[in-house]
Design a protein with these regions (language model features):
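Conserved HGGG/HGGXW glycine-rich cap/lid loop of the alpha/beta-hydrolase fold
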Residues: 5-76
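Active-site loop/oxyanion-hole signature of alpha/beta-hydrolase fold enzymes
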Residues: 51, 55-110
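Gly/Ala-rich beta-loop-alpha elbow adjacent to hydrolase catalytic centers
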Residues: 111, 115, 119
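Flexible "cap/lid" loop of the alpha/beta hydrolase fold
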Residues: 120, 124-125, 132-161
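Conserved alpha/beta-hydrolase catalytic His-Asp/Glu region
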Residues: 143-144, 165-213, 220
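Short beta-strand/loop motif that positions the catalytic acidic residue
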Residues: 224, 230-232, 236
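Conserved alpha/beta-hydrolase "acid-adjacent" motif
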Residues: 237-243
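Catalytic active-site module of serine/aspartate enzymes centered on a nucleophile-bearing elbow/loop
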Residues: 254-286
Length: 286
């Protein structure tokens, strides 16, 4: 099993051979490698693929002090998480450790939600990004549209007595349209199982969420000179689609693909359209 190491924390990644420049897939808060299965299948063979588990997710180490997960939530602070490597800068440094371990020079970097934030930070701090694909994400900062209050309330208003699967299903609802979940009950059940197998521990998920809250590259990305594809669902109830337009206005060389009526998990809900846009963009810059 390939692993990289940074500051004593082991970062797991998968590496599939291909003919062209590696495509690197970076996940959102708490999500495991499963979330990119549709896109990985679409580029497999033509492109080399690298898929790391973010710190605290899947087979990667959490790197959290042993006592921290046992502390009452109100005593856990963003500073504690940051010292344990949970800032967007720290997660981008983990990604650099992976790419250094693989030994690649240039990559097509694809990130969704928090993964899109890591991708932006990586492109600013390091020099391997040949292109960026930013899905359902934001540049952060005071101008970015935050998670809607209605979504926040839903995520934290978990029904009493719900078991682990029921809690996960409840919290996941805002990430999909009701139309999609009603039409795909078996897939939603499978996603729950994938999440139980690969997702972050509760403490690591909290640490990743704290990293997102501290993210702001709204000024730095103005000087970014990397071809960028921006994909966003117009009905995203987690990171509103206005953030895609802000990114397109701020990054110099961009292509904006708004997918009408799609959700935060647009890469699942409208995988074919995302794959078509991604494949065309990668081929253009290969």
């Amino acid at each position: 099993m390939p692993r990289a190491s940074r500051d004593g924390v082991s970062i797991y990644y998968e590496h599939d051979d291909g003919d062209d420049t590696p495509v690197v897939f970076v996940q959102g808060v708490g999500y495991g490698r499963w979330m990119w299965r549709w896109q990985r299948e679409a580029v497999a063979g033509d492109y080399e693929v690298i898929a790391p588990d973010n710190r605290g997710t899947g087979r990667s180490d959490a790197g959290l002090p042993p006592l921290l997960p046992r502390l009452p939530q109100k005593l856990r602070t963003p500073v504690m998480f940051k010292l344990a490597g949970y800032s967007i800068e720290g997660l981008a440094a983990d990604l650099e450790a992976v790419l250094e371990d693989v030994g690649v020079r240039n990559v097509h970097l694809v990130g969704a939600s928090m993964g899109g934030m890591i991708a932006q930070q990586y492109a600013i701090d390091y020099r391997r990004a040949k292109t960026l694909t930013l899905v359902c994400t934001s540049h952060g900062g005071p101008d970015a549209a935050p998670v809607p209050e209605e979504t926040r309330e839903h995520i934290f208003d978990v029904p009493k007595g719900a078991n682990k699967r029921e809690r996960m299903r409840h919290r996941m609802r805002p990430a999909f349209t009701e139309r999609f979940t009603n039409r795909n009950p078996h897939l939603m059940d499978r996603i729950i199982e994938w999440r139980l197998e690969q997702d972050a521990t509760p403490a690591a998920r909290e640490a990743q969420a704290a990293a997102v809250l501290g993210f702001d590259v709204s000024e730095e990305i103005r000087s970014l000179r990397v071809p960028t594809l921006i994909i966003h669902g117009t009905d995203d109830r987690v990171i509103p689609a206005v953030n895609a337009r802000l990114l397109a206005e701020t990054i110099l060389e961009t292509r904006l693909e708004l997918i009408e009526g799609s959700s935060h998990c647009v890469f699942i809900e409208d995988a074919d359209r995302v794959n078509e846009a991604l494949g065309s963009f990668l081929d253009e810059h290969e």
